[in-house]
Amino acid sequence: MDKLTIQASPPLAGDVIISGAKNAALPILMAGVLAETDFVVSNVPNLRDVSTSCKLLRCLGAEVTELGDGQIRISTTNLNEFCAPYDLVKTMRASILILGPLLARYGTADVSLPGGCAIGARPVNLHLHGLEMMGAKIEVKEGYIKARVDGRLKGAHIFMDMVSVGATENLLMAAALADGETVIENAAREPEVIDLANCLIAMGAKITGVGSATLRIQGVERLQGCEYRVMPDRIETGSFLVAAAVTRGRIRCLKADPASLESVIAKLEDAGAKITTGEDWIELDMEGKRPKAVNIKTAPYPGFPTDMQAQFCVLNALAQGTATITETIFENRFMHVPELIRMGATMELEGNTCIIQGIESLSGAQVMATDLRASASLVIAGLVADGKTIVDRIYHLDRGYEHIEQKFQGLGAHVERVQ
C-alpha cells in the first residue's frame, strides 16, 4: 500500500494549477444518465472516485470514453442495467447520486446503501423522502434501495429538514425530468450544487433560483447532451493556501475560483496572510510570519466548509495563541486530532469542539490517514514537522487530490510517494 514520506520543507513558493472539483464532477457525471445524446464533460480530475463513477456508468451499460486531458464522453444509448452494485457503491458514497437520474429517466433504480469516508452517519433518508414525495415507491431491503415509479415522477413541493448537498443534487436531477414543477426549499447553496444546476440548464433543464435556498424546477420531457466544464476545486485550493500559510510561504493558485472561497480567504487573512485575487487566481503571501490563531465554526455554504476544518486544525496547532474549531456538519470528524497529537500538537476535544493551543513546532511521526481531508491535514503537518513524517493509507488522499505529491514538489516541498 502506498505511503507518503515528508521531510521538513522550506516555505512553499511558486504557482500551482488547481484541478476540477471532485464534488462537482461526480454529480455531473451521474447527470449524464439523463441525457439522450452524447454528453462531454471537461476539467474532470483524475481521481479514484471519478474512476469509480465511470465504472458505475459502464456497469449500467453506458459507453464512457476518456478522451484525455480531463475530458470524458458519456453515451447512454445502450444503457440497459438499473442496479448500482455493492462492490462499487461501498467505496464511494456519491454513488447514491445515480438514484435520481435512473429513476427519472427509466422509472427503476436499485442502489446499494453507500460507503465512503467513515465520518458519521450521513443518512440517505432525505434523498428517499424527496423522491417519495415525487411519486416514487421505495423500499430498502437486503442492503439495497429499490425505487420504482409508474410513468414520470411528479413535481412536488419539498422542504428539506436539514441542508444536504447530496439530497439537493439527487432531487434536482430527478426533478429535471419530472412532470410539472418541483420546488426544493432549504436547498443546499454550495458552489458544486450551482455547477450541477448550470450543467442541467445547458442540457435543457428549466431551473430558477440557482444559488439560493429555494430551487424551482419546471420538468421537461427530455434532456440533451452538451459540453460542460467542471468548476475548479475550492477545497484543493484552500488546502494549498493553508499549506503555504503554515510554511510561511508565498504561492499562487491558478485556474482557481476565488468567489467560491470567501469564508476561507477571510480566515486566512485573520491569520495574518496577505491575499490578492484575480478572476481565476489567488495569491497568498505569509511574508515569513507565523500565523495567528483563528476560531472556526463549520456551517453549510456560504459558511466555513467542513472540508477545510482539518487543515485549519494544523494551522492553529502552529499558530500564535489559542483557538477553538467547532464542527457542526458531521459527527466523528476529528479523527485527525489523535494523529496530530502524536506529532506533538496541543489539542483537546470537548464534544464537537477542538481546543488548540499553538506551539512553535511539530515532530515527524508515522501517522495514519483516516479520511480524505484528515489525510490532507497530516501532509500539511509533515511539511513543517522536524524530521520525517510517514502518512499511511493515502488511498483516502487519492480519492480527492490529483497528483498531490507532484504539486507539492513543484512548490518546493519534500514529499515522496513510496510503495
From Swiss-Prot:
Residues reported in the UniProt entry to bind UDP-N-acetyl-alpha-D-glucosamine: 93, 307, 329
Gene Ontology CC: cytoplasm
Subcellular location: Cytoplasm
Keyword Cell division among UniProt keywords: yes
Protein name from the UniProt record: UDP-N-acetylglucosamine 1-carboxyvinyltransferase
PANTHER family in UniProt: UDP-N-ACETYLGLUCOSAMINE 1-CARBOXYVINYLTRANSFERASE
Chain's gene name: murA
Residue sites binding phosphoenolpyruvate per the record: 22-23
Modified residues annotated as 2-(S-cysteinyl)pyruvic acid O-phosphothioketal in this record: 117
Domain of life: Bacteria
GO molecular function, one term: UDP-N-acetylglucosamine 1-carboxyvinyltransferase activity
Record key words, sorted: Cell cycle, Cell division, Cell shape, Cell wall biogenesis/degradation, Cytoplasm, Peptidoglycan synthesis, Pyruvate, Transferase
Catalysed reactions listed for this entry: phosphoenolpyruvate + UDP-N-acetyl-alpha-D-glucosamine = UDP-N-acetyl-3-O-(1-carboxyvinyl)-alpha-D-glucosamine + phosphate
Taxonomic lineage: Bacteria, Pseudomonadati, Pseudomonadota, Gammaproteobacteria, Alteromonadales
